[in-house]
Amino acid sequence: MGNVKKFIFDVDGTLTPSRKKITPEFFDEFFQFTEENDVYLVTGSDRGKTLEQITPEIYNNCKRVYNCSGSDVYEGDKNVYRDDWELPAAVERFLQDELDFSQFTLRNGNHIERRPGAVNFSILGRGKDPSEGRE
């Protein structure tokens, strides 16, 4: 036990390309790494997105995963901490007004994304990329 090293990794842009899934080649290498070391993950993404990116096998092999920048913490499938903060209605109205009055015309949907302990706001949005819908 004394020789086990502890490592902390970000997910987006470190273990995976931003907002994409882990590559099959790197999956094999990193899974083995999690078998031999104590691995912790810290990410701004929620648990669902993190599971999509790195797979349940790697996620559950990590000692602890800090989702939503530490506001939603898991050890395997067990939620060990969740920040109960909620977006105040006045702030949500302000963000909606900013969205409504913005002159930026390109919109992808999912502009106000509530997460444990945080909110993600984007005029562009985090919905489907318009280029994905083109044929």
For the regions a protein language model found, what residue spans apply to each?
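Short loop/turn elements that form and flank the Walker-type P-loop nucleotide-binding site
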Residues: G2-N3, E36
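Active-site phosphate-binding/coordination module
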Residues: K20-H111
